[in-house]
Amino acid sequence: SCSLVGSEMCIRDSHNIELEHPDYIQIHPTTLYSSKPGRRFLISESVRGEGAVLLNGKGERFTDELQPRDVVAAAIFNEMEKENSNHVWLSLAPIDEEVIQNHFPNIYEHCLEEGYDVTKEPIPVVPAQHYFMGGVKVNMKSKTTMNNLYAAGETSCNGVHGANRLASNSLLESLVFAKRAVNDMDFD
Protein backbone atom coordinates (compact mmCIF):
# COMPACT_ATOMS: atom_id res chain seq x y z
CA SER A 1 0.00 0.00 0.00
CA CYS A 2 1.08 3.61 -0.53
CA SER A 3 2.33 5.69 2.39
CA LEU A 4 3.46 9.24 3.11
CA VAL A 5 7.08 8.22 2.80
CA GLY A 6 7.99 6.94 -0.65
CA SER A 7 4.44 7.12 -2.02
CA GLU A 8 5.76 8.30 -5.38
CA MET A 9 7.46 4.92 -5.71
CA CYS A 10 4.16 3.15 -5.06
CA ILE A 11 2.38 5.29 -7.65
CA ARG A 12 5.25 4.80 -10.10
CA ASP A 13 5.10 1.02 -9.69
CA SER A 14 1.35 0.84 -10.17
CA HIS A 15 1.52 2.87 -13.42
CA ASN A 16 4.82 1.54 -14.86
CA ILE A 17 6.44 4.98 -14.80
CA GLU A 18 10.21 4.84 -15.35
CA LEU A 19 12.55 5.30 -12.40
CA GLU A 20 16.08 6.67 -12.60
CA HIS A 21 19.03 6.24 -10.23
CA PRO A 22 17.33 4.63 -7.21
CA ASP A 23 20.80 4.33 -5.67
CA TYR A 24 21.31 8.11 -5.48
CA ILE A 25 20.56 8.57 -1.79
CA GLN A 26 22.28 11.31 0.17
CA ILE A 27 23.30 10.57 3.73
CA HIS A 28 23.56 13.54 6.10
CA PRO A 29 26.50 13.04 8.48
CA THR A 30 25.04 14.51 11.66
CA THR A 31 21.61 13.71 13.01
CA LEU A 32 20.96 13.54 16.73
CA TYR A 33 21.23 9.94 17.89
CA SER A 34 18.19 8.81 19.86
CA SER A 35 16.91 5.44 20.97
CA LYS A 36 13.37 6.77 20.44
CA PRO A 37 11.56 5.62 17.29
CA GLY A 38 10.85 8.07 14.47
CA ARG A 39 12.72 10.52 12.32
CA ARG A 40 16.10 11.80 13.41
CA PHE A 41 16.66 15.50 14.14
CA LEU A 42 19.17 16.98 11.71
CA ILE A 43 22.12 18.85 13.20
CA SER A 44 22.92 21.35 10.46
CA GLU A 45 26.37 21.33 8.92
CA SER A 46 26.48 25.06 9.62
CA VAL A 47 27.21 24.06 13.24
CA ARG A 48 30.37 22.37 11.98
CA GLY A 49 31.03 25.43 9.84
CA GLU A 50 31.01 27.54 13.02
CA GLY A 51 33.60 25.25 14.62
CA ALA A 52 31.89 22.17 16.11
CA VAL A 53 34.10 19.08 16.00
CA LEU A 54 33.42 15.36 15.69
CA LEU A 55 34.88 13.15 18.40
CA ASN A 56 35.15 9.41 18.86
CA GLY A 57 34.44 7.62 22.13
CA LYS A 58 37.93 8.53 23.42
CA GLY A 59 37.25 12.23 22.83
CA GLU A 60 39.61 12.36 19.81
CA ARG A 61 38.92 14.18 16.56
CA PHE A 62 38.95 11.73 13.66
CA THR A 63 38.10 13.73 10.52
CA ASP A 64 37.96 17.18 8.93
CA GLU A 65 34.36 18.18 9.63
CA LEU A 66 34.20 20.56 6.64
CA GLN A 67 34.63 17.92 3.96
CA PRO A 68 31.66 17.03 1.70
CA ARG A 69 28.73 15.26 3.37
CA ASP A 70 29.47 11.86 1.86
CA VAL A 71 33.11 11.99 3.03
CA VAL A 72 32.19 13.03 6.59
CA ALA A 73 29.42 10.41 6.76
CA ALA A 74 31.85 7.70 5.60
CA ALA A 75 34.39 8.79 8.24
CA ILE A 76 31.69 8.60 10.93
CA PHE A 77 30.54 5.14 9.79
CA ASN A 78 34.18 3.99 9.79
CA GLU A 79 34.74 5.33 13.31
CA MET A 80 31.52 3.74 14.57
CA GLU A 81 32.61 0.40 13.12
CA LYS A 82 36.10 0.67 14.65
CA GLU A 83 34.61 1.41 18.07
CA ASN A 84 31.62 -0.92 17.72
CA SER A 85 29.41 2.07 18.60
CA ASN A 86 26.02 3.29 17.41
CA HIS A 87 27.10 6.96 17.31
CA VAL A 88 30.00 9.41 17.57
CA TRP A 89 30.04 12.73 19.42
CA LEU A 90 29.69 16.30 18.17
CA SER A 91 31.19 18.94 20.44
CA LEU A 92 30.03 22.54 20.13
CA ALA A 93 32.56 23.63 22.78
CA PRO A 94 34.57 25.72 20.26
CA ILE A 95 31.46 27.85 19.62
CA ASP A 96 30.57 30.71 21.97
CA GLU A 97 27.40 30.00 23.98
CA GLU A 98 25.75 33.22 22.75
CA VAL A 99 26.39 32.20 19.12
CA ILE A 100 24.83 28.79 19.78
CA GLN A 101 21.70 30.27 21.35
CA ASN A 102 21.32 33.04 18.74
CA HIS A 103 22.31 31.20 15.55
CA PHE A 104 21.11 27.69 16.40
CA PRO A 105 18.11 28.11 18.74
CA ASN A 106 16.20 25.12 17.33
CA ILE A 107 19.18 22.80 17.69
CA TYR A 108 19.85 24.11 21.20
CA GLU A 109 16.20 23.64 22.28
CA HIS A 110 15.74 20.23 20.67
CA CYS A 111 18.91 18.90 22.26
CA LEU A 112 17.73 20.20 25.65
CA GLU A 113 14.46 18.31 25.13
CA GLU A 114 16.53 15.17 24.51
CA GLY A 115 18.54 15.78 27.69
CA TYR A 116 21.68 17.35 26.20
CA ASP A 117 22.93 20.86 26.87
CA VAL A 118 25.12 21.54 23.83
CA THR A 119 26.78 24.43 25.67
CA LYS A 120 28.13 22.03 28.31
CA GLU A 121 28.52 18.59 26.69
CA PRO A 122 28.95 16.87 23.33
CA ILE A 123 25.90 15.31 21.71
CA PRO A 124 25.62 11.85 20.12
CA VAL A 125 25.25 11.99 16.33
CA VAL A 126 24.79 9.42 13.60
CA PRO A 127 24.49 9.64 9.80
CA ALA A 128 20.98 9.24 8.37
CA GLN A 129 19.23 9.27 5.03
CA HIS A 130 18.60 12.86 4.04
CA TYR A 131 17.71 13.37 0.38
CA PHE A 132 16.85 11.24 -2.65
CA MET A 133 18.47 12.46 -5.88
CA GLY A 134 17.01 9.56 -7.85
CA GLY A 135 13.33 9.25 -8.55
CA VAL A 136 10.77 9.38 -11.31
CA LYS A 137 12.58 9.85 -14.62
CA VAL A 138 11.78 13.25 -16.14
CA ASN A 139 13.02 15.33 -19.06
CA MET A 140 14.21 18.91 -18.72
CA LYS A 141 10.57 20.09 -18.71
CA SER A 142 9.70 17.75 -15.79
CA LYS A 143 7.64 15.44 -18.02
CA THR A 144 7.58 11.79 -16.94
CA THR A 145 7.28 8.72 -19.14
CA MET A 146 3.51 8.71 -18.47
CA ASN A 147 1.40 10.93 -20.72
CA ASN A 148 0.34 14.21 -19.03
CA LEU A 149 2.19 13.48 -15.79
CA TYR A 150 4.86 15.86 -14.54
CA ALA A 151 7.10 15.53 -11.49
CA ALA A 152 9.34 18.07 -9.76
CA GLY A 153 11.37 18.21 -6.59
CA GLU A 154 12.65 15.26 -4.60
CA THR A 155 10.20 12.86 -6.24
CA SER A 156 11.85 13.36 -9.64
CA CYS A 157 15.26 12.68 -11.13
CA ASN A 158 16.25 15.33 -13.65
CA GLY A 159 19.99 14.78 -13.29
CA VAL A 160 21.00 18.23 -12.04
CA HIS A 161 22.45 16.94 -8.75
CA GLY A 162 24.24 13.82 -9.93
CA ALA A 163 24.89 11.40 -7.08
CA ASN A 164 25.62 14.02 -4.38
CA ARG A 165 23.49 17.15 -3.99
CA LEU A 166 25.02 20.36 -2.63
CA ALA A 167 23.29 21.96 0.35
CA SER A 168 20.25 24.11 -0.49
CA ASN A 169 20.35 23.41 -4.24
CA SER A 170 17.17 21.35 -4.03
CA LEU A 171 15.00 24.40 -3.32
CA LEU A 172 16.14 26.14 -6.49
CA GLU A 173 15.81 22.90 -8.45
CA SER A 174 12.22 22.43 -7.25
CA LEU A 175 11.23 25.97 -8.22
CA VAL A 176 12.91 25.90 -11.64
CA PHE A 177 11.56 22.49 -12.64
CA ALA A 178 8.05 23.22 -11.33
CA LYS A 179 7.99 26.37 -13.45
CA ARG A 180 9.25 24.42 -16.47
CA ALA A 181 6.46 21.89 -15.94
CA VAL A 182 3.78 24.59 -15.77
CA ASN A 183 5.17 26.30 -18.87
CA ASP A 184 5.05 23.00 -20.78
CA MET A 185 1.50 22.02 -19.78
CA ASP A 186 -1.38 22.46 -22.20
CA PHE A 187 -4.26 24.03 -20.28
CA ASP A 188 -6.70 24.14 -23.23
Residue ranges and their predicted role:
Residues E8, N106-I107, F177, A181:
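Short, well-ordered amphipathic alpha-helical segments that serve as non-catalytic structural scaffolds
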Residues K143-L166:
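Short FAD-binding loop at a beta-strand-to-alpha-helix junction that anchors the flavin cofactor
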Residues H15-E18, N148-L149, S174-D188:
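Internal hydrophobic alpha-helix adjacent to the cofactor/substrate pocket in enzyme cavities
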Residues S35-R40, V160-S170:
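Short beta-alpha connecting loops at secondary-structure transitions
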Residues P105-L149:
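FAD/FMN-dependent oxidoreductases across multiple families
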Residues S1-G6, C10-I11:
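Single conserved hydrophobic/aromatic residue that forms the stacking wall/gate
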Residues H15-I123, D184:
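An anion/pyrophosphate-binding glycine-rich loop and adjacent beta-alpha core
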